[in-house]
Regions:
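Distinct, well-ordered alpha-helical segments
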Residues: 22-23, 44-58
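Rossmann-like AdoMet/SAM-dependent catalytic core
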Residues: 2, 7-10, 18-32, 59, ...
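Switch II (G3) loop of P-loop NTPases
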Residues: 39-43
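Hydrophobic anchor residue in the Rossmann-like NAD(P) cofactor-binding loop of oxidoreductases
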Residues: 13
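Short, Asp-centered acidic motifs that coordinate Mg2+ and/or phosphate
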Residues: 35
């Protein structure tokens, strides 16, 4: 269906501009309020190489107001994913995250913590907002749906989404919110 409000460009997203790929530079310079939805099965890392080239390419993110992105293959792209997120978090607030339950978890870090192998994240540009408070909403929310209906949902619970260290007398426990053996919901003070 053709509509004048939309322009469909038959190119893959990547690091370079070619006849078959775009790094979105032209569009990111041309438009000032971009909503970017990207689910390109690992190709986000090639696009990140372009974004991370220099300060001028990174600053193109100022023209993007929202990003909905699926990040893939943390089991093999772990360091690239961390670098990509670090860059995006300089410009954006993460307002939603959902683990793709079809892809389970990445290989555990050396410290034993795990994270989703594939996850969807929604980001809003910081320039559009004053300082926002962290949400106490549990993830997944009632609006989320499983990617695969017959698999268990993947839980992050509430902010902050990192492992918590619990000290009890002389013992120290690392509690991971990512469907570890500590999968139940509970609260505690650190």
């Amino acid at each position: 269906v053709k509509r004048q409000e939309f322009t469909f460009i038959k190119k893959n997203i990547g690091e370079k501009e070619t006849a078959f790929t775009t790094n979105l530079e032209t569009y990111m310079k041309q438009y000032r309020s971009i909503f970017l939805k990207m689910d390109i099965e690992g190709g986000e890392y090639d696009w990140f190489k372009f974004l991370n080239k220099d300060e001028s390419t990174r600053n193109l993110l100022d023209n993007v107001t929202q990003i909905v992105l699926e990040i893939h293959s943390l089991n093999v792209q772990n360091e690239q994913a961390k670098s990509l997120l670090k860059l995006l978090f300089e410009y954006f607030y993460a307002i939603h995250i959902h683990g793709n339950n079809a892809c389970w978890f990445s290989t555990p870090e050396p410290d034993g913590c795990q994270f989703f192998n594939v996850f969807e994240i929604t980001l809003l540009n910081k320039r559009c907002f004053n300082i926002i408070e962290p949400s106490n909403e549990e993830f997944p929310t009632n609006y989320d749906m499983k990617n695969t209906l017959h698999n268990q949902e993947l839980y992050l619970y509430t902010y902050p989404f990192y492992e918590r260290i619990v000290r009890c007398d002389y013992d120290v426990y690392k509690i991971s919110p990512w469907n570890s053996v500590y999968n139940d919901k509970f609260e505690f003070d650190i």
